[in-house]
């Protein structure tokens, strides 16, 4: 090439001193020799190390940014799943709150006890007020609950509601308000609760 030609001309010229020719020839041989290591100046080595250290220090930040971008891309791949799960969780939470409020929405103003049905609260309030709306028409007994009155009729006044069926020894249970008879106490209780429910209340005495 041209550089080699110029170097040959410079070496063959008469203007160079023998020492200068020897130095140029040694440099040319070193440049073309594959086994000779390349020597870098200290300023170039320091600059190269500084650039390498800066690149290595920036590597963790780059990796963290790449990981965050991959997380975002994964979420964007399934937007309907993410929104669906969020809406599902919100719906479940709202449903549980609604269920809890519907189960315990009646509170006693005296003790704070809660009930799921209004009639349960109404029955409970009689514990505080002392109200006894159910009365026995065969005596002066009064009760807070209708079940207690029916139990009273079938136990205290059992001889009144129990009759003997002719020659048979089987007992039949007659209604104290009408002439109907029943084969069991349970049937009589259902009859009293249905047909004569108003007659069991004290306000109708």
UniProtKB/Swiss-Prot annotation:
SMART domains: ZnF_C2H2. It comes from the Eukaryota. Coiled coil: none annotated. A zinc finger (C2H2-type) spans 106-128, 134-157, 173-196. GO terms for biological process: female analia development; female genitalia development; male analia development; male genitalia development; negative regulation of receptor signaling pathway via JAK-STAT; regulation of transcription by RNA polymerase II. Its main location: nucleus. Pfam families: zf-C2H2. This is Probable transcription factor Ken.
